[in-house]
Amino acid sequence: MSAKEVIAQLKSFANLERKKINERFFKTGPGQYSEHDKFIGVRVPQIRLIAKQHFKQIDFSEIDQLIINPIHEVRFCALIILMNQYQANNQETVFNYYLDNISSVNNWDLVDTTVPAIIGDYLVNNSEKTVLLFKWANSDDLWERRIAIVATFAFIRQNQFKLTLAIGQLLLKDQEDLIHKAVGWMLREVYKKDINICMAFLRENYAQLPRTTLRYAIERMPEIDRKAYLKGTF
């Protein structure tokens, strides 16, 4: 399977109205976080289907052409292909390839869909490499910082919370709303596993918590607790 064939198949599902919706939803205007991105309007289920159909027949030389493509849906398909290959037990090779192409993981949906399944899962089983998360958390690149916190989702699923809290704390002073949301999301996932650990973190770091992070983190709390945290009266 060639990259050209995959791209042609994706383009066959292109939809102008969906393209316009995605351009607004992903904020592609001048100065916005997706200014670099181009959309053709392919729905995620269609992208997943194409990736599933071809991940066994496509090699890295063809994925090379997909993963650097300026079209968002093409890069997304490349990353889903990698995720499928990783889950088919090609783990170390896919992990290293993903690292080599991490600059192409440059929008929040690309991060959120594939990072826990590849980066996070690999690090759970190779803890000596978790230093990468701290490197990314201190990066000037928005997407690397989001990768750092979202990768810890794989650890949360294993009831391991230390990395989430450590990376989350590093990112509390971040200026980007997309980081505030990601940290809050991961804290909410911690809350679903261990209420006390999450609440202790919120109390200890309350003065530094961006409001968006707090709102995301407390979504699952009973109303009385949510109000207390919003008012700082816990």
Feature roles, as predicted:
Residues M1-F234:
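Alpha-helical scaffold domains
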